[in-house]
Amino acid sequence: MNLNATFFAQMVVFFILWWVVAKFIWPPLVKALDERAKKIADGLAAAEKGKAELELANKRVDQAMAEARTEGAQRVADAEKRAQLTAEEIKQNAQAEAARIIAQAKAEAEQQVTRARESLRDQVAVLAVKGAEQILKREVNAQVHSDLLNQLKAEL
């Protein structure tokens, strides 16, 4: 192989070029590649963190929804229970009012029956006295015979 000056000149130019590239071009290029790799890694980490936060947020939302459903069901159950209690209370009040009205009507009827009996007793006593008067053809004194008349009323 023939080694001539051209080859040595090419070698010198190659080493000078290699030194310039290694000194001035390679470090910024490596730095840019490292920065880009770091940005990509940071982006992937941020994406993973965002994905984890999204899953956590979804879990919190699901939990909040479950709590809201439970609370809503509890409120509905409480409202139904209150409505049932109110209906029972109204029913009991109505029954008590009906019983009171029935008792009052029975008492009034009893009073009317008692008054009617008293009135009938008085009328029967008067009729008995008049009948006895006519039978005896003389007047019976009501004051003198009040015991007899009271006994007659009691028997009727």
Swiss-Prot record:
InterPro entries: ATP_synth_B-like_membr_sf, ATP_synth_b/b'su_bac/chlpt, ATP_synth_F0_bsu_bac, ATP_synthase_B_chain. Gene3D superfamilies: 6.10.250.1580. It holds the Pfam family ATP-synt_B. The chain crosses the membrane at residues 7-27. GO terms for molecular function: proton-transporting ATP synthase activity, rotational mechanism; proton-transporting ATPase activity, rotational mechanism. GO terms for cellular component: plasma membrane; proton-transporting ATP synthase complex. Coiled coil: none annotated. It is found in: Cell inner membrane. It is a single-pass membrane protein. Keywords: ATP synthesis, Cell inner membrane, Cell membrane, CF(0), Hydrogen ion transport, Ion transport, Membrane, Transmembrane, Transmembrane helix, Transport. F(1)F(0) ATP synthase produces ATP from ADP in the presence of a proton or sodium gradient. F-type ATPases consist of two structural domains, F(1) containing the extramembraneous catalytic core and F(0) containing the membrane proton channel, linked together by a central stalk and a peripheral stalk. During catalysis, ATP synthesis in the catalytic domain of F(1) is coupled via a rotary mechanism of the central stalk subunits to proton translocation. PANTHER family: ATP SYNTHASE SUBUNIT B (PTHR33445:SF1), ATP SYNTHASE SUBUNIT B', CHLOROPLASTIC (PTHR33445). Belongs to the ATPase B chain family. F-type ATPases have 2 components, F(1) - the catalytic core - and F(0) - the membrane proton channel. F(1) has five subunits: alpha(3), beta(3), gamma(1), delta(1), epsilon(1). F(0) has three main subunits: a(1), b(2) and c(10-14). The alpha and beta chains form an alternating ring which encloses part of the gamma chain. F(1) is attached to F(0) by a central stalk formed by the gamma and epsilon chains, while a peripheral stalk is formed by the delta and b chains. HAMAP family: ATP_synth_b_bprime (MF_01398). This is ATP synthase subunit b. The lineage of its organism: Bacteria, Pseudomonadati, Pseudomonadota, Betaproteobacteria, Burkholderiales.
